[in-house]
């Protein structure tokens, strides 16, 4: 009997059909970036200070410039963190309507030292030094309410986590295409509703709904294109699918620069999702999934459609996809399948840890470097460019030395770079930046590798579930990373880097325990996945008897 990989060798492993499908799914990948990192622009926090009606009237009467108004009426102006808090969150508790106040240094008539004047929290709102708007400026998510911005980002990661578990199961149970279209529809509607949210609470609800479906949709797209192409092109489309995400980062920076209003920006980045609903007529169901569910007739119909699109025909000798008579009923994925057998259990635990590590180091290094500066658009753009060399290195090495060693080395390089940064003195700033970029490049490679290899280690009927469950650990990492960075820096500025170093080095060592997937067909059954490990001893070359008869391969 034939496998899908056998048939693709004859009808085209990456011909017209696969190229068109990849292009459509790459658009989906790029459109995910505003949800994953859009907080940089949607939640931008500009310089701000308390607004006082009395001080504003006095400024107008005296004809002060903006600099003079800030100097005369805002406490604690200075470079220190304490001074920044005072200037942004506190005000002088004085009556600005007093007739004794002069236009030149008005507070001098009340106290010889203005530091002796009583201070209080802002009562009438804030003045924001920005021409645009963000959720911070509209809902005043600053000072005592700054935690609400953290919650805004945390809730989308909670959505990522729940959605990965829920939709991953549904995609393996009811099909990739159905779940992909459902996630696109919900993402489009919730994104549009978020743009017109009347208050913070409703905005939070729609943000959660976006998180619930958006990441799962991105990963389903990854699984789909991986299952449509032949063995020789899996790694290429996997890497290019993630490069499309990086291209989305660059486009997002440009769109955010052109549209500085957060509501219109949210509309702009949501609109493509409505266009993606047309994929109902453009992208078929995965024939690999159909075969795993014993829907052989439908699978062969799609395979013939692919062959026709590629200008090929399916050889008669390869059209026998009928399972054995005793193959039993179609397989239903279960969470227990991810840990039931020894090798798959090992794969699951190592992959979960590496997803967690990639998220913590990727986001943590960005936070620790403090990339956001005077121009967030350029900073964001330049930081995205770092990801292209990482993808280029993977393309150069992955077919020459395999997946496992580049993946392990990239984790170790990231960890070693973090450790080296601890011992570099501050006066060698150029060296610290260079090492930091090296670490960012290493963890970017690791992030791309874990996504690529994850899909190659699971059998077809639990592949989508395995990818989404394991990748949910990066959502846990995304939730705790801000606390990890900011709490540990209170103890010692370099403390987070020490933690990152240990986590990264351990991740690299664990990768070496995984089997090499270079040049191997995607496992179709649990038996295939259990026997992926390189043979060592004769007694280890066995098929696990606990695998059910229904799990036999079709060929």
From Swiss-Prot:
The protein's matches in SUPFAM superfamilies, at most eight in alphabetical order, are given as: MFS general substrate transporter
Q: Which reaction(s) does the protein catalyse, per the Swiss-Prot or TrEMBL entry? A: (R)-noradrenaline(out) = (R)-noradrenaline(in); (R)-adrenaline(out) = (R)-adrenaline(in); serotonin(out) = serotonin(in); dopamine(out) = dopamine(in)
Mapped to this chain, the residue ranges on the Cytoplasmic side of the membrane are 1-21, 172-177, 232-238, 285-348, 397-404, 454-464, 516-555
What lineage does the source organism belong to? Eukaryota, Metazoa, Chordata, Craniata, Vertebrata
Please summarize the record's notes on activators and inhibitors of this protein.
Answer: Tyrosine phosphorylation of the transporter leads to activation of the transport activity. Inhibited by cGMP, most likely through a cGMP-binding protein that interacts with OCT2.
Found in which tissues? Answer: Expressed in the kidney, in the proximal tubules of cortex and of the outer medulla. In brain, highly expressed predominantly in regions located at the brain-cerebrospinal fluid border, in the leptomeninges, in the choroid plexus and in a layer boarding the third ventricle. In brain, also observed in the granular cell layer of the cerebellum and in the granular layer and pyramidal cells of the hippocampus in the CA1-CA3 regions. Expressed in tracheal and bronchial ciliated epithelium in the respiratory tract. Expression is greater in the kidney of male than of female.
Locate the motif Proline-rich sequence. 284-288
Q: Where in the cell is it found?
A: Basolateral cell membrane; Basal cell membrane; Apical cell membrane
Q: Name the protein family.
A: Belongs to the major facilitator (TC 2.A.1) superfamily. Organic cation transporter (TC 2.A.1.19) family.
Q: Which spans are transmembrane here?
A: 22-42, 151-171, 178-198, 211-231, 239-259, 264-284, 349-369, 376-396, 405-425, 433-453, 465-485, 495-515
What is the organism of origin for this protein? Rattus norvegicus (Rat)
What single Pfam family name could you report for this chain, choosing any that match?
Answer: Sugar_tr
Q: What's its job?
A: Electrogenic voltage-dependent transporter that mediates the transport of a variety of organic cations such as endogenous bioactive amines, cationic drugs and xenobiotics. Functions as a Na(+)-independent, bidirectional uniporter. Cation cellular uptake or release is driven by the electrochemical potential, i.e. membrane potential and concentration gradient. However, may also engage electroneutral cation exchange when saturating concentrations of cation substrates are reached.
The membrane topology noted for this protein in its Swiss-Prot or TrEMBL record is: Multi-pass membrane protein
Which cellular component terms (GO) are annotated to the entry?
apical plasma membrane; basal plasma membrane; basolateral plasma membrane; cholinergic synapse; plasma membrane; presynaptic membrane; synaptic vesicle membrane
* Further remarks about this protein from its record: Mediates the renal secretion of many clinically used cationic drugs. Transports drugs such as diabetes treatment medicine metformin and neurotoxins 1-methyl-4-phenylpyridinium (MPP(+)), famotidine, ranitidine, amantadine, acriflavine, amiloride, memantine, cimetidine, cisplatin, oxaliplatin, platinum-based drugs cisplatin and oxaliplatin, 3'-azido-3'-deoxythymidine (AZT) and tetraethylammonium (TEA). Mediates the bidirectional transport of MPP(+). Metformin competitively inhibits OCT1-mediated thiamine uptake, leading to a decrease in hepatic steatosis.
List, alphabetically, the PANTHER family matched. SOLUTE CARRIER FAMILY 22 MEMBER (PTHR24064)
Write out the coiled-coil annotation as residue ranges: none
Q: Which GO terms describe its biological process?
A: acetylcholine transport; amine transport; amino acid import across plasma membrane; cellular detoxification; choline transport; dopamine transport; dopamine uptake; epinephrine transport
Its UniProt domain note says:
Contains one proline-rich sequence (Pro-Glu-Ser-Pro-Arg) that may be involved in tyrosine-protein kinase YES1 binding and is required for the activation of substrate transport.
Name listed for the protein in its UniProt record: Solute carrier family 22 member 2
**Membrane topology, Extracellular segments:** 43-150, 199-210, 260-263, 370-375, 426-432, 486-494
**At the top level of its lineage, which domain of life is listed?**
Eukaryota
């Amino acid at each position: 009997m034939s496998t899908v990989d056998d048939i693709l060798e004859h009808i085209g492993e990456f011909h017209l059909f696969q190229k068109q499908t990849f292009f459509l799914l790459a658009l989906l990948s790029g459109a995910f970036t505003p949800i994953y990192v859009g907080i940089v622009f949607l939640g931008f926090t500009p310089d701000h200070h308390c607004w006082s009606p009395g001080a504003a009237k006095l400024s107008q009467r005296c004809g002060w410039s903006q600099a003079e108004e800030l100097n005369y009426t805002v406490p604690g102006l200075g470079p220190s963190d304490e001074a920044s808090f005072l200037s942004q969150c506190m005000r002088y508790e004085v009556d600005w309507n007093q007739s004794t106040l002069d236009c030149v240094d008005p507070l001098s008539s009340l106290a010889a030292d203005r530091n002796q004047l009583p201070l209080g929290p802002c009562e009438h709102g804030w003045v924001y030094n920005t021409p645009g708007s963000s959720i911070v400026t509209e809902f005043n998510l600053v000072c005592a309410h700054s935690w609400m911005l953290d919650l805004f980002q945390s809730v989308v990661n909670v959505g990522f986590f729940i959605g990965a578990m829920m939709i991953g199961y549904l995609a393996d149970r009811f099909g990739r295409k159905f779940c992909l279209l459902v996630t696109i529809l919900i993402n489009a509607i919730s994104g549009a509703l978020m743009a017109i949210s009347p208050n913070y609470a409703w905005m939070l609800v729609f943000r959660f709904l976006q998180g619930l479906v958006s990441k799962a949709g991105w990963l389903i797209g990854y699984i789909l294109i991986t299952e449509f192409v032949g063995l020789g092109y899996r790694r290429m489309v996997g890497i290019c699918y993630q490069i499309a995400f990086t291209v989305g980062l660059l486009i997002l920076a440009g769109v955010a620069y052109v549209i500085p209003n957060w509501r219109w920006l949210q509309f702009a980045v949501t609109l493509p999702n409505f266009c993606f609903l047309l994929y109902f007529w453009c992208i078929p169901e995965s024939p690999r999934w159909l075969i795993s569910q014993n829907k052989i007739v439908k699978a062969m119909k799609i395979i013939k459609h692919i062959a026709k699109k590629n200008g090929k025909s399916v050889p008669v000798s390869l059209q026998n996809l009928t399972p054995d008579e005793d193959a039993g009923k179609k397989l239903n994925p279960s969470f227990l399948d991810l840990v039931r057998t020894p090798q798959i259990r090992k794969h699951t635990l190592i992959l979960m840890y590496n997803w967690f590590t990639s998220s913590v180091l990727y986001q943590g290094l960005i936070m620790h470097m403090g990339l956001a500066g005077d121009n967030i658009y350029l900073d964001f753009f330049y930081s995205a460019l770092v990801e292209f060399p990482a993808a280029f290195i993977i393309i150069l090495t992955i077919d020459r030395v395999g997946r496992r060693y580049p993946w392990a080395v990239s984790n170790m390089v990231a960890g070693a770079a973090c450790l080296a940064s601890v011992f570099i003195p501050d006066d060698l700033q150029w060296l610290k930046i260079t090492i930091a970029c090296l670490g960012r490049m290493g963890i970017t490679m690791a992030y791309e590798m874990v996504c690529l290899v994850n899909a190659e280690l699971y059998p077809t009927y639990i592949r989508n579930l395995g990818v989404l469950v394991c990748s949910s650990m990066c959502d846990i990492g995304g939730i705790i990373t801000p606390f990890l960075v900011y709490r540990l820096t209170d103890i010692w500025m370099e403390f987070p880097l020490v933690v990152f170093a240990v986590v990264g080095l351990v991740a690299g060592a664990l990768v070496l325990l995984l089997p090499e997937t270079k040049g191997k067909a995607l496992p179709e059954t649990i038996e295939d996945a259990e026997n992926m490990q390189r043979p060592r001893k004769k007694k280890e070359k066995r098929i696990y008897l606990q695998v059910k008869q229904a799990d036999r391969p079709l060929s």
